[in-house]
Amino acid sequence: PQTGENGSGWMYMYTDSLIRGFRQTHQPSPWINDYGTFSIMPVFGKLVTDNKSRGMSFRHENEKAAPDCYRVRFDNGVTTALSATSRGAVFEITYPSEEGQYIVVDAYQHGGSVAFDKEQNCIYGTTRYNNGGVPENFGNHFIVEFDKPVVEAGTDENSCAYVRFRLNAGETLTVHTASSFISHEQARLNLSREVDGRSLADVSAEAKRIWDEQMGRIKVEGGTEEQQKTFYSCLYRTLLFPREFYEFNEQEEPVYYSPYDGLVHNGYMYTDNGFWDTFRAVHPLFTLIYPEVSERIMQSVLNAYNESGFMPEWASPGHRGCMIGNNSISLLTDAWMKGIRTFDKDKALEAMVHQTQARSEEISSVGRDGYAEYDSLGYVPYPEVHEATAKTLEYAYADWCLARFAEATGHKDVADTYYQKAQNYRNLFYSEKGFMWANDSDGKWRENFDATEWGGPFTEGCSWHWTWSVFHDPEGLSSLLGSHKLMAARLDSMFVAPNTYNYGTYGFVIHEIAEMVALDMGQYAHGNQPIQHAIYLYNYVGEPWKAQYHTRNVMNRLYNSGPEGYCGDEDNGQTSAWYIFTALGFYPVCPGTSEYVLGSPLFPKVTISLPEGKTFVIDAEGVSDNNCYIRTAELNGVDFTRNYLKHDELLKGGEFRLLMDSVPNMERGINTEDFPYSYSTK
């Protein structure tokens, strides 16, 4: 359902009272907006095609939404229900009386076209709507079929088509639709395969089966009903992106229209994903729970490289100028280290190295912005390069990932080079202030240090948030901060420091600032990604019980199953995936290590279904709101003192038993051999 006007990134607002269309959307974010969009809208009474005027009022008590089906009864008595497949959908629509029964199909202008085919009793068209990241020949080709005779049809000047029916009051009109980015012929093939001749009930039942299988791979037991609703709502959101952009030809082979070179290729393509967000927890979740999806995504990343010269960092559907870093390298490395090795390792290494040594001329976020300065100075200088300190920290982590991959695939010379570059984070630690800060190209520290200043050398945050972005070497960060105890004290202070801010170069209070202030958790800003791993860093400095306390506190305070269930941007599933992992009791602080750092499990029992029929069971005896601390742990009956689990330990299956308590065990997980990976101690 679309409540916003065409072109608005806010396509469905819970506070809105009008629906303007039922939209085939590909939108991954309101900031990125949509592409390849068309909508289908019942209109009753007077014919109105314009999206600004055709909306019909509804109330939420007459609306029901589930992963497999959506239903609404409008205030004028029209009912609409729909269920979707991968590339199509089925609608059932009824009208309260016989006069003025219309369907409007909107191709969103932007050079789109629509027409009515009388012989086929269908509307077909092409929508070319986009907000960037597409070749010149881009189009989404669609077909909309009706099971009742059309008595009138027409089009308007705004790429809308309409049809009128004359049905009995309450009689069901069934609409079948499908689309293709390849051609109308492929759209027809998609329609015949996925929805042709199928009822709403058929499609809904199949959708429910698929969602049950996907979400059923993690079974939680116990906890409150609200906690279970929140958990599975987060899992649902995590599974929405990235989007399958491939189709199947007549031979049932995967093919796709490339949003990079505009040609049709064999193989897999995924899109609608910002790796700056999703490398942290979404893709690590796929490697563990949905490895077959992760395999195809890695192939897709390299397909994009072959077709454009760069791996994607933010794709929708092609390269978009958004965010920073080289986190495509993280995805490939993490997958490889976890045994997902169906992609070309030599091509992957070639693509990784190229990603660090070039930058797209058109889009600064594609490739490595400031790579020449980074290589010559050991950091990206500010103000010469926007967001330079954040980029330096991101590049250092990406270089570590590249080194890990090169080492694992037998390229020691490359590994040695990039392991050295992975230490560049040290070059922007301002020891006099104890925070990450900015240097110019002459090596001078930026004046007027302010750890609460947003923007400038940082991305959507301040030094309080970005100082922790040393995923691959918390031990090295600890040495910069002075000791394990001093790093733990700095983490403590993050939660109690005044939640003041300086909006800096942003010039106004961006929503991430407002969200941090509203959370009232000091300088901890869970509503945005850079700091979401920071709680788990207590495990690296011998105070794991604090990670257990704070992770539970964040889950309980900042998430719920309602319309306002997130404390900030959900961002392609990342904020949801944080909750999924954290509710299980562990989190992938550093993708590429194959380690999951412990927190506090939320449920008494969780069963994870794994490949080859294996299961990994997490038993948290005595867990409750008060009992958030780990007293003791056993892995397959053997005492377990480490602050992390290994990926291979999970994949083998088994049982992880935890005895939970209301008071912390300050003797568990305090020895350095129990700490997770850091490059400085490898």
Q: Model-predicted segments: where are they?
A:
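Extracellular attachment/recognition segments
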Residues: 629
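Accessory carbohydrate-recognition regions in carbohydrate-active enzymes
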Residues: 1-330, 336-393, 401-427, 433-436, ...
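ATP-dependent phospho-/nucleotidyl transfer catalytic cores
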Residues: 398
